[in-house]
């Protein structure tokens, strides 16, 4: 009996700790993404180390925006702020004019599809890898997402279609095929915003270029933000911003100038990279 009572109180303590550490829901307003995302002089840092310094950025809905810059410049931090995983230390982020902190954060995140750098696939079917077992998603939803990701053609050619087993870590598929399935996973919930965080870095140039063309075709129905050092994702973007020393600088003119100047491109008197 004493052992059972001890286990009971240990469980109660664990539940209380989990409830205390639970993330608050944020604001009460229902989010939508119909107009634009705006960063207004947003700053963030870790301790005394500043990461973002009074960043201003406007992303119109339905456009493709690329963020470039050296490792550690704060590109992922900027995405974490947008996903409400972090909170600005000063400044604000507005979604259609509404401060992000006033929105229900869980509903806001449901509007976001996120594709990370590392491709993680289960040793299971293509269907399971797209839906991740979500009972709200059907085979029709998976097919739609795979079509959007440019993957349906190769899925149809497999012997078992959606029920095809991809192998350990997707080993039965090519790198491009694996990446398209991960993108389809992000698209399955019909996001309004798709974030690509170095999502094509492991692909060969031909596969990367094909996927970038597919991602561009998602606009204007979906807003796309891509973090990348690679030319293919930059060349298809409507706007390109370089994050350097905590500040955002817009690259104007021919995109080749980014590769001509590199990550330490000079800044003109207007705060933009000089045009060719």
Where are these regions (language model features)?
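Pre-NBD coupling/linker segments of ABC/ABC-like ATPases
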Residues: 20-32
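An intracellular "coupling" helix at the cytosolic face of ABC transporter transmembrane type-1 domains
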Residues: 3, 13, 17-20, 43, ...
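Cytosolic ends of transmembrane helices, especially the final helix of ABC transmembrane type-1 domains
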Residues: 1-14, 125
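ABC-type nucleotide-binding domain
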Residues: 30-276
């Amino acid at each position: 009996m004493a052992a059972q009572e001890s286990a009971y109180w240990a469980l109660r303590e664990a539940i209380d700790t989990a409830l205390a550490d639970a993330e608050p829901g944020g604001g009460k307003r229902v989010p939508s993404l119909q107009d634009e995302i705006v960063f207004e002089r947003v700053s963030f840092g870790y301790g005394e180390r500043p990461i973002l310094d009074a960043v201003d950025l406007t992303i119109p809905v339905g456009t493709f925006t690329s963020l470039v810059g050296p490792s550690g410049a704060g590109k992922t931090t900027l995405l974490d702020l947008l996903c409400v995983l972090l909170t600005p230390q000063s400044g604000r982020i507005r979604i259609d004019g509404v401060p992000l902190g006033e929105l229900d954060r869980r509903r806001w995140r449901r509007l976001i599809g996120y594709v990370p750098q590392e491709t993680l696939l289960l040793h299971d079917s293509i269907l399971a890898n797209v839906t991740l077992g979500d009972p709200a998603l059907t085979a029709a939803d998976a097919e739609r997402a795979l079509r959007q990701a440019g993957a349906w053609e190769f899925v149809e050619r497999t012997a078992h279609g959606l029920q095809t087993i991809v192998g350990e870590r997707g080993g039965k598929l090519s790198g491009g095929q694996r990446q398209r399935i991960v993108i389809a996973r992000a698209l399955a919930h019909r996001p309004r915003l798709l974030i690509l965080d170095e999502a094509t870095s492991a692909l060969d140039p031909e596969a990367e270029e094909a996927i970038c063309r597919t991602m561009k075709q998602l606009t204007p129905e979906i807003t796309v933000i891509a973090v990348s050092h690679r030319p293919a994702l930059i060349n298809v973007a409507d706007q390109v911003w370089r994050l350097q020393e905590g500040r955002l600088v817009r690259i104007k003119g021919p995109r080749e100038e980014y590769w001509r100047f590199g990550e330490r491109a000079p800044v003109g008197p207007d705060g933009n990279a000089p045009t060719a």
